[in-house]
Amino acid sequence: MDLVKPEEISHPPMDQLQGLEYCIDSNPPWGEAIALGFEHYILALGTAVMIPSILVPMMGGDDGDKVRVVQTLLFLQGVNTLLQTLFGTRLPTVIGGSYAFMVPIISIIHDSSLTRIEDPQLRFLSTMRAVQGAIIVASSVQIILGFSQMWAICSRFFSPIGMVPVIALTGFGLFNRGFPVVGNCVEIGLPMLILFVIFSQYLKNFQFRQFPVVERFALIIALIIVWAYAHVLTASGAYKHRPHQTQLNCRTDMSNLISSAPWIKIPYPLQWGAPSFDAGHAFAMMAAVLVSLIESTGAFKAAARLASATPPPPHVLSRGIGWQGIGILLNGLFGTLSGSSVSVENIGLLGSTRVGSRRVIQISAGFMIFFSMLGKFGALFASIPFTIFAAVYCVLFGLVASVGLSFLQFTNMNSLRNLFIVGVSLFLGLSIPEYFRDFSMKALHGPAHTNAGWFNDFLNTIFLSSPMVALMVAVFLDNTLDYKETARDRGLPWWAKFRTFKGDSRNEEFYTLPFNLNRFFPPS
């Protein structure tokens, strides 16, 4: 047997992912683009419905209030997605709600000045205004860091080895929203997971008139089948005598969104009244803004990879963070009960469909805005059981995590230093947030429990985020352990040309602003 030569089994690093049908600036035919945009819209509904469904009842709101918040959040998702794809990073990213904001928001909900209000509707409005005020003030963090280019300066300390744990945990860190939620209704969650894998992977070469229809629309095909199956189970009375929580997770008629939704409703700023401002609430909310900044930074790099673009230069990253801050400000003004962050599941769908086109995401933003104003039609799609979304998350979150691991190709993984940094960062990025979650479940408060509530919320929010913990550990270790002698091992030569906008000719192709706006905002 002949010896295998190393060059025959090695895989040279590639700064652009190969194998996509359409990259960031190539567009499918209009019909296909519209259908793919609708698929991204359907996927974005999961977060848009789940966050208000958790928070609104805690605030004293009814089903009508929940529908208005869902519509408002969906409307702002569309607006912020358009802003990001036009003027921000210009990557094909959906900007959705962020779970990072739930800790400070729940703290505001339990504020003694609000819980003493007896009238549920008045308590809901008062709490909403307090949340709005905190989000409006906290949004200034990302606006300042982004548009002042301070985040560009910070991101120059990020090497491939330092970003691997951050991007990987952008996906892996969401494991509790995957199969643990599928397990709440296995009879519809497991079939959805299996069908989605079969359609997107095993049947991806099935073509109709030379078009890979199953691969492109695996999500919609599987969703239609399982949603119809879930409706049959509901109509047949399969859940009639099951516990209430099981019915919430499995039935297709439990959300009350359709009956509570108006036919037409256009969200507008300050629709809940004038926001109220509290320094403690605002400071705690700033932690959530910092977390969404880190999570979005990792997600932007993953999106660039799955859109077959080059790594975004620091200037572009900072610009995107600035516009995300504008989006958080709009969320506060409109009252969405959430800030903004890049939707990780929609990034995963770029890889699943092999379509990284910017136009597709802009079309999906149009669907979000349109259906948020047509309440009944939007509520129809929003009534899909969340278990179905969780099944898809199991695949898409894992795909995004693997994109993070793919950055190891630029580094020397025969280096004990690099093995130490990656391993410790990944482990602590999973272990520390899990400790904070377990502690909170048992003690009903986080490990940080002092007399200063804002300080508790700040620390608990920071350390509940896996990408945040991973970034602190990985970037610190990477920039303090033999950093001068190991530039090549860290992968810095590969990213050197992407540190400035003009360092690579492809940057101009992928990241130049439209309408010749680069004249007024020259890249650094």
UniProtKB/Swiss-Prot annotation:
Q: Cross-referenced Pfam families, in alphabetical order?
A: Xan_ur_permease
Q: Does the keyword Transmembrane helix apply?
A: yes
> At the top level of its lineage, which domain of life is listed?
Eukaryota
Q: GO CC terms for this protein? A: membrane
Tissues and organs where the protein is expressed, per its UniProt entry = Expressed in cotyledons 10 days after imbibition (DAI). Expressed in the minor and major veins of cotyledons and leaves, in the shoot apex and pedicels. Expressed in the root meristems, root tips and lateral root primordia.
Entry's transmembrane regions: 41-61, 69-89, 91-111, 133-153, 155-175, 179-199, 217-237, 282-302, 359-379, 380-400, 419-439, 457-477
Q: Which InterPro entries match?
A: MetI-like_sf, NCS2
UniProt keywords (A-Z) are: Membrane, Transmembrane, Transmembrane helix, Transport
List the membrane topology term(s).
Multi-pass membrane protein
| NCBIfam families found in the cross-reference section | NCS2_1
- Name the UniProt record assigns to this protein: Nucleobase-ascorbate transporter 2
Q: Which organism is it from?
A: Arabidopsis thaliana (Mouse-ear cress)
| Species classification | Eukaryota, Viridiplantae, Streptophyta, Embryophyta, Tracheophyta
Gene name, per UniProt, is NAT2
